[in-house]
Amino acid sequence: MARKKIALIGGGQIGGVLAQLCALRELGDVVLFDIVEGLPQGKCLDIAEASPVDGFDVCLKGTNSYEDIAGADVVIVTAGLPRKPGMSRDDLIEVNSKIMTSVAEGIKQYAPNSFVIVISNPLDAMVTLCQKVTGFPYNRVIGQAGVLDSARFATFIAWELGVSVKDVTAMTLGGHGDDMVPLVRYASVKGIPVMELLERKYGSKEKAKEVMDAMVNRTRLAGGEVVALLKTGSAFYSPASSAIAMAESILKDQKRVLPTCAYLQGEFGVNGYYVGVPCVLGEKGIENIIEFSLDAEEQAMMDKSVAAVKSLVDSLK
């Protein structure tokens, strides 16, 4: 049986980590594409030379030609300029739109049967543009944001409560921006509501809410926190890990429920836009969008987040 093939578009920080993670997990053979000559070739050579030490056995190829992505099962797109301190994700839209259009044309021509996972920012606009240019079915073009945002939320909860991140369940909805919706009511530790644990820790609902509000705010601004510390770019380890979780669920038909930037056609009251919602990811890409009830406060936050997404995406038209 032929090995799976993963194409990574963009040989920067995220692309390099993606290539390494694909190799370490032996998800399939890897093609790393970048327009800069030598960059993807050098990174793939470096990773390949670690294979005897780490014990993985896959083929890694760096390239400057889209022809080499032919036959890819999954394409992960990271190409685009990263954020610098003081920039929002939305500030990148003009330059990254041009890059995404070129990338999507390459994918359409050489990997017409692939599943596409977009990481490039501003995410909600870039995944919309990628689908539009490729013309691929909506279930085959998705965006990575919610897995990362949810992981950040879970991390902060685990730190606050002094528990393993493995036992924290947390999820965000909406756009990948400052108006994202971390779902406090559904956050839990081994099924125990986080708010109840915070109330027990601090002895009052008021203090528990104050602490949770701080974690929600930190989650919304977490990407900018990393950008401010790095000063030269944006996060790359956690976005790569998040995209790999999505790719693995598709390649192995795991049917994991993962927050995914998906095209909505009436779900959650949204029609015709890519928005972050929980989805079942399997061999058909998005196999199911999971809807559930939001209370009035959650719905208001979701409406605000969706409005921000619409404003951003409509600026492309």
UniProtKB/Swiss-Prot annotation:
UniProt-listed GO biological process terms: carboxylic acid metabolic process; tricarboxylic acid cycle
EC assignment: 1.1.1.37
Listed Gene3D superfamilies: Lactate dehydrogenase/glycoside hydrolase, family 4, C-terminal, NAD(P)-binding Rossmann-like Domain
GO CC annotation terms, alphabetical: cytoplasm
Entry keyword annotation includes Transmembrane: no
Catalytic activity, reaction form: (S)-malate + NAD(+) = oxaloacetate + NADH + H(+)
Binding annotation for substrate: 83, 89, 121, 152
Superkingdom, taxonomy of origin: Bacteria
Active site positions: 176 (proton acceptor)
Cited InterPro entries: L-lactate/malate_DH (IPR001557), Lactate/malate_DH_C (IPR022383), Lactate/malate_DH_N (IPR001236), Lactate_DH/Glyco_Ohase_4_C (IPR015955), Malate_DH_type3 (IPR011275), NAD(P)-bd_dom_sf (IPR036291)
SUPFAM superfamilies registered for this protein in UniProt: LDH C-terminal domain-like, NAD(P)-binding Rossmann-fold domains
Binding positions (NAD(+)): 10-15, 34, 96, 119-121
Keywords noted in UniProt: NAD, Oxidoreductase, Tricarboxylic acid cycle
An example molecular function term from Gene Ontology annotations: L-malate dehydrogenase (NAD+) activity
Described function: Catalyzes the reversible oxidation of malate to oxaloacetate.
Similarity remark: Belongs to the LDH/MDH superfamily. MDH type 3 family.
Record protein name field: Malate dehydrogenase
Organism in which the protein naturally occurs: Geobacter sulfurreducens (strain ATCC 51573 / DSM 12127 / PCA)
